[in-house]
């Protein structure tokens, strides 16, 4: 996120509530609201929210391929600059998602580090 007087980054928020995840790792409406507040703290504007319920995370894209496509459509339609995931992503998942979504991708931990940088 940029904290200078440059263009405010528009963020798409995404999360996964997988049955195979520990309860504290699952995204919920409450955790996505907290994520939106973190984005605002970092100087961004949350404009899109997507929550997927799925048995297990996709090892390649974390969300299912259909949800990744839906998120991409929402990112384009809402002129988003950034996608922020409520869950921890692996470096390879972040790389694949950046390629698929066409925007910078952060997870919750990366966003928090960005706030305190």
Where are these regions (language model features)?
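N-terminal accessory targeting/assembly segments
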Residues: 1-114
């Amino acid at each position: 996120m940029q904290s200078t007087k440059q263009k405010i980054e528009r963020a798409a928020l995404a999360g996964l509530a997988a049955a195979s995840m520990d309860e504290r790792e699952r995204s919920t409406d409450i955790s996505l609201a907290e994520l939106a507040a973190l984005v605002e703290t970092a100087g961004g504007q949350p404009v899109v929210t997507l929550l997927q319920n799925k048995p297990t995370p996709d090892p390649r894209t974390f969300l299912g391929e259909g949800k990744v496509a839906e998120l991409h459509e929402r990112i384009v339609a809402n002129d988003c600059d950034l996608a922020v995931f409520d869950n921890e992503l692996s470096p390879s998942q972040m790389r694949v998602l950046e390629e698929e979504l066409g925007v910078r991708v952060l997870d919750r931990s990366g966003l928090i580090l960005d706030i305190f940088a």
